Design a protein with these regions (language model features):
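Short, small-residue-biased leader/transition segments that mark boundaries at the very start
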Residues: 1-3
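A conserved active-site cap/scaffold subdomain adjacent to cofactor or substrate pockets
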Residues: 6-91, 101-103
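Short gly/pro/ser/thr-enriched loop/turn and capping motifs at secondary-structure boundaries
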Residues: 94-98
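Catalytic-core signal marking the mid-to-C-terminal active-site face
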Residues: 104-231
Length: 231
């Protein structure tokens, strides 16, 4: 705000990060309801002042990607998103109030964040979504149902978000497929990504200098295994 006062329209992000402590121990409580309210208030302040706003949410106190992790991330990120924040930091992968992160959490949180973004998008009301012509075609001239209509097939892709890991099978199919829980599926998916995705973000010469200096164990490609450097 001080920068905007001196230089109107200067690029800036309003990024306040007030944190909550559990008064019984003094430990940070990033997944608390109080933390969610504080971050939502910061987002609303940013909207009031007309500033692009970034807040922190998704900072569960749980040390594992368990039920506590899910419900704390769910309500903190959802409240922040619906309060009008433009950016939400720490929203994926974080555990133990920012003292750790977890590959399984990243892929679980990807599902969660997609669903939350869908709720922020809300219900679109326009000529296409009201579909009066489609109703007339189906109800007065057609089969009386929408199952095979081209608009139904189209809106299946635009209106619905399908989770990558979340289970929506019926009970019998779930049992037949091994009765896995989301942590097990997330572990397999995280390993699959790590073993098959090799982004090229570093100049090869710089990467070689880093590998010569440190015992890097990460593969650079699906067929190359890097052995630790022997000192």
């Amino acid at each position: 705000m001080c920068i905007r006062d001196r230089v109107p329209r200067a690029p800036a992000i309003f990024g306040t990060w007030p944190f909550v402590s559990d008064l019984r121990t003094g430990a940070m409580s990033g997944g608390s309801g109080e933390q969610a309210v504080l971050m939502a208030a910061c987002a609303q302040m940013g909207r009031y002042y007309g500033l692009p706003t970034g807040i922190a949410a998704g900072m569960t106190d749980s040390k594992l990607p368990d039920a506590q992790s899910g419900y704390e991330k769910g309500y903190t990120v959802t409240l922040g998103a619906h309060s009008g924040a433009n950016l939400i930091y720490e929203s994926a992968g974080m555990q133990a109030s920012l003292l750790g992160c977890c590959p399984e959490s990243y892929v679980i949180d990807n599902d969660m964040l997609g669903a939350i973004n869908r709720t922020v998008r809300g219900i679109e009301v326009n000529e296409d979504t009201m579909a009066f012509e489609t109703m007339q075609q189906v109800c007065t001239e057609g089969p009386g149902h929408y199952l095979g209509h081209e608009q139904t097939l189209s809106r299946m892709q635009s209106d619905y978000l399908y989770p990558e890991l979340g289970d929506r099978e019926n009970i019998n199919n779930w049992i037949d497929q091994g009765s896995s829980n989301i942590e097990e599926r997330a572990s397999l998916r995280a390993r699959e990504i790590i073993e098959s995705h090799f982004p090229d973000h570093i100049d090869p010469e710089i990467e070689m200098r880093i590998r010569n200096e440190f015992p890097v164990r990460i593969q650079t490609g699906p067929s190359q295994t890097i052995e630790p450097r022997v000192a």
